[in-house]
């Protein structure tokens, strides 16, 4: 199965990608991870990307697409893969098609913005051991202190409500249109995010016919 995962930041794509990857025995391809690997391994496209990163510039789409195609040509992708975080825009999706990358299904995990903001802004990270707690779903025992090491709990900049809202705005403007893109090709499957990871996994497996 060749799968693209869609959904807003905080929808749980990474978690579900890991679960599906184990169940289907196919790799999860995360753009950030393969970009770092390509640069570290010094592949031709990786070296090109490195020149942009080192000069503080955004890596252009054609280089990102090149790195993705390079990774998908590896033997472990022969039976399928899960693309997480790629494509992010319609031009990227069109470029993948032009390179002969034909996915089977685009799975969209649906969740309300308000729920995402509540989830992410409720996260607290320990300054000392980097453990993550949540003031609602996994509350700490002592106010402002990590249960594991007693370190100070902080809100990461990425989890601040204004940052989360800004990321959601970008998602709605740039990535959400991909749902129509894949729906027009008869490849979109949508699943509502559930209150628990297990329930969301069950809904995904049912939608994909993996029960």
Describe each region flagged by the PLM.
Residues 1-211:
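Glycine-rich phosphate-binding loop of ATP-dependent small-molecule kinases
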């Amino acid at each position: 199965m060749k799968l693209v995962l869609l959904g807003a930041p905080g929808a749980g794509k990474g978690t579900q990608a890991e679960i599906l990857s184990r169940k289907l025995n196919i790799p999860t391809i995360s753009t950030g991870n393969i970009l770092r690997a390509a640069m570290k391994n010094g592949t031709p496209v990786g070296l090109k990307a490195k020149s942009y990163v080192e000069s503080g510039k955004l890596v252009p789409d054609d280089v990102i697409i090149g790195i993705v195609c390079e990774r998908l040509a590896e033997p472990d992708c022969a039976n399928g893969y899960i693309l997480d975080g790629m494509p992010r825009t319609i031009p990227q999706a069109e470029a993948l098609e032009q390179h002969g990358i034909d996915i089977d299904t685009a799975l969209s995990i649906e969740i309300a913005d308000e729920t995402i903001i509540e989830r992410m802004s409720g996260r607290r990270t320990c300054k000392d051991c980097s453990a993550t707690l949540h003031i609602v779903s996994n509350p700490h025992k002592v106010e402002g202190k990590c249960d594991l090491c007693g370190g100070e709990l902080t809100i990461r900049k990425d989890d601040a409500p204004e940052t989360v809202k800004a990321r959601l705005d970008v998602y709605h403007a740039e990535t959400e249109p991909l749902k129509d893109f894949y729906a027009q090709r008869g490849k979109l499957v949508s699943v509502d995010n559930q209150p628990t990871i297990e329930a969301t996994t069950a809904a995904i497996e049912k939608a994909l016919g993996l029960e």
